[in-house]
Amino acid sequence: MHVAAAAPDKLVDETRELAAQAHATGHPDALVGGLDPNEDLAELERQLDEQLTTKRFRGIRIMGEGDHAIPTPGILQALQDRGLLFELMVHPDALAPAAAALAGWELPVVVEHTGWPRSNDPEEHELWRAGMADLAGLRANVTCKLSGLAMPMQSMAAATFAPWIHHAIELFGTDRCMFASNFPVDGMHGSFDDLYTAYATVVAGLDDDARARLFADNAERLYRLD
């Protein structure tokens, strides 16, 4: 599973290259592309349609800060009309505004990087808790991707991850959460095995079915990894 890199002028090229790679190697099994929200809607729709020419394309995320990364109604309509998902990547101070913008839409939404906190600061944590509660309360089609914690926490320790992951699962439930990595960025703080060992430690108290949902089943369903 591949999610778009931060290359706003090469987003369609990236999807095209990944489609060729998948044809040759079988991987990635699915991909999330990107859009530049500064483009007019007709151009955005053209870019979506071009990326849809690969059967592995599942949706888009927008890279940016604050309101820039919150999709407009036009973008959401274009995605919904095409059966695509939207991956939300904003910091805690933009989670509540994002929830307001997403209210009422039926397309699948993925909250990336566990709501993307910037630090373990108590004020950041409170902003995060409030915004995540707003997003979790929208609808059953909003999922939390449990990822992206190693960089802001500068650690892959299970004890560091636990408060964030436990609260996200409390809000969204194990039916609407899934583990993911943020490699290669996560690699500054440990290995892939370190990351998933920490995840496994954090949820060791859950039953087998719940862990299966977090580590595989939910992602397979959402991204249609069949």
Feature-to-residue mapping (PLM):
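Catalytic pocket-lining loop regions of alpha/beta-barrel enzymes
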Residues: A69-M178
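Conserved, mostly hydrophobic/aromatic
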Residues: L18, L31, L79, H113, ...
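Mid-to-C-terminal alpha-helical segments outside catalytic/metal-binding sites
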Residues: H167, L171-M178, G187-D226
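Short, electropositive alpha-helical surface patch
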Residues: L11-D29, A162-E170, L195-V202
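Short, glycine/acidic-enriched loop or turn micro-motifs at the edges of active sites
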Residues: E39, W116, V185
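Glycine-rich, proline-tolerant flexible connector loops at the mouths of alpha/beta enzymes
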Residues: M1-K10
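Active-site gating/metal-coordination segments in enzymes
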Residues: D9-A94, A100, K145-A150
